[in-house]
Every structure is written in structure tokens, then in C-alpha cells.
Amino acid sequence: MSGPLRKHHPLLKVVNHSVIDLPVPSNISVMWNFGSLLGLCLVSQILTGLFLAMHYTADVNLAFSSVAHICRDVNYGWLLRNLHANGASFMFICLYMHIGRGLYYGSYFYVETWNIGVMLLVLTMATAFLGYVLPWGQMSFWGATVITNLFSAIPYFGPDLVQWLWGGFSVDNATLTRFFAFHFFLPFMIAGLSVVHLLFLHQTGANNPTGLAGDVDKVPFHAYFSYKDVVGFVVLLAGLVFIALFSPNLLTDPENYIPANPLVTPVHIQPEWYFLFAYAILRSIPNKLGGVVALAMSIVVLFFMPFVHSSRQTSHNFRPLAQVLFWLMVVNVLLLTWLGGQPVEYPYIFLGQAASVIYFVNILLFIPIVGYVENKLLFS
């Protein structure tokens, strides 16, 4: 058979159609780099996590000591732990940038790709939460207690569900063991779902900044965008290594360097920084069930994006009114992130409630109204 091997070999042609001869709109910007950066983060997390798992012990009496042992006695264990802990932060930075790009340029019109992406977000958040419990420090233990306790708000079978999750009547050895098992398993599930995400993306082709059909001007992915992705890889890895070497505790909670003690509650229980926006929404509602519903809806609302978009234009590029709403949403999420780390007192309670209302009203009410107004102004 004539032609390059990559074009007719059963395995290589799949790779060829995905990353070599894939037709890509020629005008996609650096904002389209975050998908590949997420792939790099996932590979990095799986590799560092695999080596950490070789030395970690999932037992309430030994977990904290085993993490200390990794950092002190294992060759480059301190580096593996720092890369893994900070790699999670970098992964969420890329994830939120990737979602932000999708919202700005209307990528949610590729409904299957978008919905699988939101599922990937939920799985990644679950994986990160499970991983935060494993060092068995104070914030690990109390974070696990508080978050799993939220399931007790589910009517009728909530309390039984919580005991089933715990494997007993409190967060204990059974909880830690199962959390470790799921933390090990879920990244591979994320990797599998990412392949499905790419499969659906390549069925429709990539979006582009204009929001118009990009079929008129496409170029092969390699070498135009493969080298562009490599530049992103270098920048991301340089940033990750810099943080891991020079300021490894910049993004972590010092409370987690205290071994877990069920008899002493930390002054302020809070999750890692990348969950603070959702935590602020949870805290803003004084009712337990209402808070849990609001927390779930803060992520589920992303599924509604294709339905609340009423404008005849896909991208925000040429929609000044919609751009104002988009940046309002970005600033609001940053404000919620800050509020989630503040104590539960005035004025933070009121500000959290106001920001939570703005978050939902902006997506479910303002976005469709502004789209309708723009249609009237531009096309009527």
C-alpha cells in the first residue's frame, strides 16, 4: 500500500486523525491550548501519584507518618509530593481557563462535547477532594467530615447514605481506605472520558474565535499547533517546577501539617482554594438542604448553557453587552473564591449571599435577556 504508514496502519491512523492530520481552524488563539495542557497535567498527576502510592499507607494511624516518610526518606519523595500537590492547583487553573474559553466563544453548542466536559469537571473535583483527605491532617479529617455530612441533607435515606460512605458511624479507617481506592481509580476514569471528549470534538471539528464555520480555512494540527502546544507545555512545567521547588506551600493550608485529631476542631474549616467559590455558595444559604442544592447547581448550571444562549451569534467576540456579563461572572467567581476563605461573620455572610444570587441570576436570567436585546438591536 502506498503512502505513509501512519495513514493506513490500524492503530497509527487513529493517532494520525487525532493529532497529526487533524484539520484545525487556522485562527484559533492561545486560549485553545488549555485542552492539551489539561492532558499534560493529567499524565503528570497519574505518574507522580503512582510513585507516591508505592510509599503511602492508607491507615489512620500511619497515613500522616507515611507522607512525612515520603518527604524525608524516599529519594526525591519531597519533589514528587510537591509536584503532585501543586499539580492539582495547576490542573484546576487550566480547567477553569478551559471552561471560561468555552463560555466566551460558545463551545457549549457542541452539546455532547460540552456535557462530557462538565462530567469531567465533576470527576476531577471528586478526585481532588478524595486526594485532600489522604494526608490525614486536620483539614483532611474535618474537610472529609463536613463534606460527606452534606449527604445527610438528602431526605429519607440521607443519614444511612452518610454511614454507608463512611463505612461506620464516623470518618475512620474504612473511610480513608475507600477514599484512597477511589482516588487511585478515578484519574483513569477521567483519562477514558477524556478520550470520549476528544472523540466527540473531532466529530464536529474545533470551534474558533469568530464563532463562524471554520471549514473555509483549516490547516493540519501538526506542525502548526503541535509546536504551539509544546510552548504551552514548557511554560506550564516551568511554572509547576518553580512553585514545587521555591514555594511548595503557597497554595496549601498550614492546618494540614497538624495530624488529624477528632477532638479538636480547626478555627476555620475550608477546602482547597479551587473549591472556595462553590463552598461560598454552600455557606450563603442558612438551610442545610438548600445549601447542598445550591452547591450542586453551581456546577449543574453549566449543563444549561446551550439552552440559555438566545443570541444569534455564537461567540462573545462581537457582543459588547454579553462581554460585560461574561466579565461580571469572572469577577463574581473570583469574589466568591475570596469569600469562601473568610470567616462566617458580617460582612462576609451578606457579601457571599449577594455574590451567590448574582452568580445564578447572571447565567439563568441576564444572559438570555441580553441575547434577546442584542438580536433586536442588530437584526430587527
Swiss-Prot record:
Task: Write out the annotated subcellular location.
Answer: Mitochondrion inner membrane
* DNA repair recorded as keyword: no
Q: Enumerate the GO terms in the molecular function aspect.
A: metal ion binding; ubiquinol-cytochrome-c reductase activity
Q: Where does heme b b562 bind?
A: 84, 183
Required co-factor?
Answer: heme b
Recite the UniProt keywords alphabetically. Electron transport, Heme, Iron, Membrane, Metal-binding, Mitochondrion, Mitochondrion inner membrane, Respiratory chain, Transmembrane, Transmembrane helix, Transport, Ubiquinone
Q: Which residues bind a ubiquinone?
A: 202
- The portions of this protein that span the membrane are 34-54, 78-99, 114-134, 179-199, 227-247, 289-309, 321-341, 348-368
- Explain how, and how many, cofactor molecules are bound: Binds 2 heme b groups non-covalently.
One Pfam family named in its UniProt record: Cytochrome_B
Q: Which InterPro entries match?
A: Cyt_b/b6_C (IPR005798), Cyt_b/b6_C_sf (IPR036150), Cyt_b/b6_N (IPR005797), Cytb/b6-like_sf (IPR027387), Cytochrome_b (IPR030689), Cytochrome_b_C_euk/bac (IPR048260), Cytochrome_b_N_euk/bac (IPR048259), Di-haem_cyt_TM (IPR016174)
Swiss-Prot/TrEMBL GO biological process terms: mitochondrial electron transport, ubiquinol to cytochrome c
Its record classes its membrane topology as:
Multi-pass membrane protein
Entry binding sites for heme b b566: 98, 197
Q: Name one GO cellular component term.
A: mitochondrial inner membrane
Q: State where it is primarily located.
A: mitochondrion
Q: How does it assemble?
A: The cytochrome bc1 complex contains 3 respiratory subunits (MT-CYB, CYC1 and UQCRFS1), 2 core proteins (UQCRC1 and UQCRC2) and probably 6 low-molecular weight proteins.
Quote the function comment for this protein. Answer: Component of the ubiquinol-cytochrome c reductase complex (complex III or cytochrome b-c1 complex) that is part of the mitochondrial respiratory chain. The b-c1 complex mediates electron transfer from ubiquinol to cytochrome c. Contributes to the generation of a proton gradient across the mitochondrial membrane that is then used for ATP synthesis.
Q: Any extra detail in the entry? A: Heme 1 (or BL or b562) is low-potential and absorbs at about 562 nm, and heme 2 (or BH or b566) is high-potential and absorbs at about 566 nm.
Question: What is the similarity comment for this entry?
Answer: Belongs to the cytochrome b family.
* Protein name, as recorded: Cytochrome b
